[in-house]
Amino acid sequence: MNKLIEKLEKIYRIFPWPEDLSSPTVNKRLDEAYKVFKDLLDHSWLKDLLEERKNKDLIVIDICGGAGIGGIALAKALMDKGLGVKLIVNDLRITALGKARRYAKQILGIEIETLIEDALKLHEHNIRADLALIYGLTTPHFDPYQMVTLIASIAWILRPNGILLVEEHDRIYQIFYRIGYKQVLAEYAGEDRIALSIHAGYDPLTGVFKRILLDIPSMERVLTDVRFWDIAGTAAILWMFFKDVDFKPTRTQIRGILIAKKPRGINPRDYTMLPTIVKGSQQT
């Protein structure tokens, strides 16, 4: 796991993902997330869950949460409705989780729990949550087989009436139809530095694109696997592990929050061993 942690830290050093609360960009992200969740809480499934748990603290887990922007925004929307919240933020990046603790204290006035763990192994912990959240640029980190394991693990730690919220974006439509796949893409360009992502291959058996993230002028680089998920593909996997799935568009019809309710109780340990096809995967 140490190698994975080191790789993620390297990715987020090169990739310009804003996490500093003093930045206007991060404050804007936080405000936007709060508005999304405040509106989402009017969904009938969430109303039912909140009514059921109104006299008890809601256990909320923000998965792959980084600095906790999504989880903190959701917790604030819940607390503003008068609900008690216990927030857990999960990630592998220790530096990001330190920020999550500070930001939660500053914004929510509460101490939160942080969990340094591979999200595929959440079921190995003694957690029983009411609400789980995947927010931000998260799903592209997981290939289809990992996504199955991830959702199985999350469903396992939720209560029988628990709900999983997943922010998703139709990247098939946006990237391959609207924009066009780029061999070389400037992810960030400023006076001080440039961050490029460069096509380095495709694995047809895992469905991931290989891209090198390159920082200029330091020339630090890292090879990443990227899966371009769409709304329907993610929703179908959610449906495998939850009894019903809905979608609430946010900015556009191709971006929003997937809502999955009532876990089916499928044991994630059934997916411990990857299928033979993955072992034989190859790059083109």
Question: How would you describe each model-predicted region?
Answer:
Residues 130-146:
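A short SAM/SAH-binding and catalytic strip from SAM-dependent methyltransferases
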Residues 71-121:
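Class I SAM-dependent methyltransferase SAM/SAH-binding core
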Residues 241-284:
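C-terminal lobe and adjacent flexible extensions of AdoMet/dcAdoMet transferase-like proteins
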Residues 167-235:
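SAM-dependent methyltransferase
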Residues 148-160:
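A short glycine-rich, Lys/Arg-flanked "PGG" loop and its adjoining helix->strand segment in the class I
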